[in-house]
Amino acid sequence: MERFMKNPKGLTTKLLENYDWDYIELPVTVNTEKLMGWYEEVVANNMHSAFIFSADKMTPYVKQRYQPLVSWWLGENTWGAAEQWTLQWPVQHDGVIPSAYLANEEQFPEAMDPDIEKNSVNLDKYFYGAYKEMYDTFPEGTFNVTRLLRFGKDTGLKKHTDVEPPDFLIRMHVQLQSSSGSHWFFGEDLEREYFMEPGKVYLYNTAIPHAAVNRDDDYWVMIHNNPGNSAVDHLLSIDSLHVG
């Protein structure tokens, strides 16, 4: 199996449950002009809701037992702080929302729900325009744990995995804006470098060590989400799709 695949026809979730591939470019494109218009409105109206990846900004929202993890995770990160907006949550919420597994129990009791992914809803303040159009066009179950993420200049994420073997998770990225200085790196030594093109949609293997960095002046902007297995199978079977 190739590390990077552009023709996923014939693949299934079952066939991808291994650690021999990094990411897949789907035959799917999106209207970046429309989505960037939506993104600019979201940022203009909701900076107060951004979860910012820096120790002082994250700590107030993170459960106590993960405080050392935050310090460790960010301590080796020499890049600037990424910003993230959570687009789905079990209740309507207007403030900062961390990743559910990190969330402070007192501030976010709903995050303790073991079925939080199934019980989450789209937050009304984000669910409109080009994003809603895209959401409604993709197969049911595509957009779970959906977040808007951006990297400014010299901003990134250090090497990490999102799950540990034998666990397995496929994540989807919709690229709204990227440029020649924005790259993902995969592998134990981050030896495999990839550029994800604006307007394209990708699946990637979160169990493979990976990191990201943006070296350009422009923001690197994406939507990322965890499609369910049936949605992944549907996405892999698509011949061609343009949204917007």
Residue ranges and their predicted role:
Residues 1-137:
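Non-heme Fe(II)/2-oxoglutarate
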